[in-house]
Amino acid sequence: MKKWVLAAAMLLAAPAVASAEGDAEAGKTVFNKCATCHQVGEGAKHALGPSLNCIAGRKAGTAEGYAAYSEALKAAGHEWSDDKLLAWFEADDKVVPGNKMIFPAGVKDPADRDNLLAFIKSQCPQ
């Protein structure tokens, strides 16, 4: 009986762990808000904003071939860690005051931010 209770508890906990990491497919839908200015995936190019391919782990303001970064973002000096990206999705102006991104609403739902992060991290064509 104890084994069944333990197994049931593990099964109930599993979805919580999976959702904390984000769902890339759901994140693709969230990314539609970003796609006005940014591209990802095979053949992505810089547009109004830089391509976000392989952004995780990259230094802020350094996408090769993109020259329209704000002085604030070029001077930020941080690496795009998961925590930095999640904070940026929520309120970019709090992460780098004076940046030029025009997305004042941010992504308010924490699950949407997790999903967006999972999607963007999946966009690193080899």
Residue ranges with predicted function:
Residues M1-W4:
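Positively charged n-region of N-terminal signal peptides that target proteins for export
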Residues F119:
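Histidine-centered phosphotransfer motif of kinases
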Residues G22-E79, A87-P97, Q123-Q126:
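Periplasmic/extracellular electron-transfer cofactor-ligation site
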Residues A13-V17:
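N-terminal signal peptide c-region/cleavage motif recognized by signal peptidases
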Residues M101-K108:
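Thiol/disulfide oxidoreductase modules built on the thioredoxin-like
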Residues L6-A9:
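Sec-dependent N-terminal signal peptides
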Residues P97-N99, R113:
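Structural micro-motif
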